[in-house]
Amino acid sequence: MYKDKYVFALLVSFIDRNHFNYLVSKYGGDKYVKFFSCWNQLLTLIFGQLSNRESLRDLTVGINVHQKKSYHLRFGKHVTKSNLAKANQNRDNRIFEDFAYFLVDEARRKRAVDIFKLDGNVYTFDSTTIDLCLDVFWWAKFRKHKGGIKIHTLYDIETQIPTFFHITSAKVNDVNAMDVIPYEIGSYYVFDRGYNDFKRLYRIKTLDSFFVVRSKKNLQYKCVKWSRRLPQNILSDAEIELTGYYPHQYYPESLRLVQYWDEELNREFTYLTNAKRLSALQIANLYKK
């Protein structure tokens, strides 16, 4: 008889079950449940993800192939498609959402490094659109004959771990997702050109956080003062004020504008930031990383 643990059981043995049980109790996940517990549901979904299952039917078939080993694999009793579907539909999703963020925090602590030598964390924020079949996901209508959702992700650059997710309709403009980012005091947030929303950028500044964003080419501004001695590849390092009517209303204070020449890509980048104590090269490296 095989006495060692299966690989899947070894993988999930690192999961903090005590904290998961705390969340289950907090949200009443196992209330009136006799067989298919939240823990069984979690392991079933993890198995489906790791084995690239494409549907609930595919997942339950894959699990029931190993029915005699289900105890050692920690799935519990016989897993059916209907039980799994009901659990996914009826149980409080906050159990799994909170536990996912708990695992992310654990992973970040174990991978903590100090690449930038800064006091705060460094994040980048961007979105990706996932196409969906309208016949199946009718609620995700994006265009006339196309469905989709957007996943907005906050990514910790130093640990290389995503720390926050926000899912919206594909129609939602990227800048709207800036409103739900859990900003941290003293941390740095790096954005691409599509996030040039000065009202939202000013909010970051008022929260005592820092941002670095690529500037649009049609930016209207005037220089207040600038540095004369510039390091290699820094074309300009200036303090500016926005002169456009609405941009100035939304961001009434001065900004820092850094122009950088990237030798690898053979092109120029222009950044806006409220981080005035960092060097110009540090600003460029925050975006480049």
Question: Would you name each region that the model predicts?
Answer:
Residues 78, 105-107:
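Juxtamembrane/interface motifs at transmembrane-helix termini
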Residues 55-73:
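DNA-recognition alpha helix
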